[in-house]
Amino acid sequence: VGGTNQASGQTSKFIALIDSDESILDSLCDLIESAGLVARRFGSAEEFLEYDLHREVGCLIAEIEMPGMSGLELQARLKEEQCNIPIIFITSNGSGKTRIQAMREGAVEFLRKPLDLQLLLETVRAALDV
């Protein structure tokens, strides 16, 4: 994971995808990889933390509402660990209050499902500074 981008010779970071819904993970993975980026899937925030790959992540796309640790709890945990990964939250139910909290805590974007795939890719590229 994390190999070298042949064209630029730079070490590439991967996009971490976190959602408990396999079909969403499949779609996001296909989208990210079709854009020439490397994606890695995680079924929960806990699974992501278990792998301890923070330094290799270029951007994180996470569902706000997941069983176990929520996206907001993950954001707080990463902040505690002084890990400044750009986070894009996705949700089908998030309230305005949740959005404000996520953005106030440093999220790059907060997108509602069904996702505007072009906007998501543009947001990922901006987060990566590509």
State each model region's role.
Residues 21-40, 127:
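Two-component/phosphorelay signaling modules centered on CheY-like receiver
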Residues 41-59:
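Acidic, metal-coordinating helix/loop segments flanking the phosphotransfer/catalytic sites
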Residues 43-44, 70-73:
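Acidic catalytic/metal-coordinating carboxylates
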Residues 66:
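Receiver (REC) domain active-site loop signature in two-component systems and cognate sites
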Residues 73, 94-109:
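Alpha4 helix (beta4-alpha4-beta5 surface) of REC/receiver domains from two-component response regulators
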Residues 97, 115-125:
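C-terminal output helix
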